[in-house]
């Protein structure tokens, strides 16, 4: 049976089962019907066998019957191709391979240290015509040369290294000394060991002992009391100078509230001194007072008569003559005149307006 026929039979049974029971068939329903169960298993086995087989056959490309002419090989072209990046024989170079030149060297091969055969090759023979045309030159191999004077070394050792050196001599200075003096001197060209204790730097025991004795004598002659007194005097002088400097500096006045009233400078009242009765003649003083009283009485008596005479004269004069005009005395004359145009008063008024 073909797979299509098996599938159609299974579908027909499923539609019939759905019409009867109003549901799709389950596994138990399929197992109950033996024929349908066999069809399901057969369909499954056929489908699984088809999947294992290759779906498409591999096509074999047969070579074409067209004959092509062979390409001639160019032996002169280099085998190693250079790309856009730096390469050597087709291989990309790194930073460390830049010293190599591409055609001769590669990062895998190292050049042998042996000399190349071209080094042992004979130089080309010179033509006789060329030798005749050339101008004669001075021979470089000089037979006689003036002797060079033996020079000393220009640089000198610094002073801080001279202390640690125990008469080291350079080869040149050693040779010069041999020429001047026949005495044999050892060629000492090695600096002394830095770890070795050097006796020349330290002091001798005698020097240390003498310095200790001097210090002991200085301590005996040294008076502590005198030193303390001199020190205290210096401190007292310093304190005096500081206090004097402080006094010279004027204290800074604090800012206070501005005036709200005008300042007036008034003279002080005279002090009432009690009259002293010493050296005073009381009788003369009493007589003067009595005479003054008499004069006042006489003047009072005479004033009544004068008033009567004046009234009669004024009445006659008022008929014929106009009364005399008197200038009016202002009240401000009784007070002290104000200094209105004083510049100080202007400043005061300006401050009061604020």
Swiss-Prot record:
Keywords attached to this entry: Cell cycle, Cytoplasm, DNA replication, Nucleus
Cytoplasm keyword on record: yes
Residue stretches of biased makeup (Basic residues): 250-266
Principal location listed in the UniProt entry: cytoplasm
Chain intervals with Polar residues compositional bias: 47-71
Keyword Aminoacyl-tRNA synthetase annotated: no
One Pfam assignment: Drc1-Sld2
InterPro entries: DNA_rep_checkpnt_protein, Sld2
Subcellular location: Cytoplasm; Nucleus
Annotated region (Disordered), positions in chain: 47-133, 159-184, 220-277
GO process annotations (BP): DNA replication initiation; double-strand break repair via break-induced replication; mitotic DNA replication preinitiation complex assembly
Molecular functions (GO terms): DNA replication origin binding; single-stranded DNA binding
GO cellular component: cytoplasm; DNA replication preinitiation complex
UniProt function note: Has a role in the initiation of DNA replication. Required at S-phase checkpoint.
Family: Belongs to the SLD2 family.
Stated name of the protein: DNA replication regulator SLD2
Provenance organism: Candida albicans (strain SC5314 / ATCC MYA-2876) (Yeast)
């Amino acid at each position: 049976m073909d797979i299509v026929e098996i599938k159609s039979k299974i579908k027909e049974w499923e539609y019939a089962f759905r019409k009867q029971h109003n549901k799709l068939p389950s596994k138990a329903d399929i197992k109950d019907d033996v024929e349908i169960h066999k069809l399901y298993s057969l369909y499954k086995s056929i489908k699984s066998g088809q999947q294992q087989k290759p779906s498409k056959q591999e096509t074999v490309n047969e070579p074409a019957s067209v004959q092509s002419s062979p390409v001639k090989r160019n032996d002169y072209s280099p085998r190693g191709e250079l790309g856009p990046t730096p390469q050597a024989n087709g291989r990309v170079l790194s930073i460390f391979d830049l010293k190599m030149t591409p055609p001769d060297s590669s990062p895998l091969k190292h050049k042998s240290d042996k000399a190349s055969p071209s080094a042992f090759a004979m130089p080309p023979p010179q033509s006789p015509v060329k030798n005749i045309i050339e101008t004669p030159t001075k021979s470089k191999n000089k037979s006689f040369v003036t002797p060079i004077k033996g020079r000393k070394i220009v640089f000198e050792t610094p002073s801080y290294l001279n202390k640690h050196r125990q008469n080291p001599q350079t080869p040149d200075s050693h040779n010069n000394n041999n020429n001047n003096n026949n005495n044999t001197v050892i060629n000492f060209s090695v600096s002394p060991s830095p770890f070795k204790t050097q006796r020349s730097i330290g002091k001798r025991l005698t020097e240390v002992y003498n310095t200790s004795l001097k210090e002991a004598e200085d301590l005996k002659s040294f008076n502590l009391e005198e030193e303390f007194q001199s020190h205290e005097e210096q401190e007292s002088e310093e304190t005096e100078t500081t206090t004097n400097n402080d006094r010279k500096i004027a204290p800074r006045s604090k800012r206070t509230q501005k005036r709200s009233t005008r300042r007036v400078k008034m003279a002080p009242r005279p002090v009432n001194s009690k009259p002293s009765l010493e050296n005073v003649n009381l009788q003369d003083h009493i007589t003067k007072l009595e005479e003054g009283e008499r004069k006042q009485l006489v003047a009072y008596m005479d004033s009544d008569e004068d008033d009567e005479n004046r009234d009669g004269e004024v009445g006659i004069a008022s008929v014929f003559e106009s009364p005399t005009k008197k200038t009016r005395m202002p009240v401000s004359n009784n007070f002290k005149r104000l200094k209105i145009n004083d510049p100080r008063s202007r400043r005061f008024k300006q401050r009061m307006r604020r």
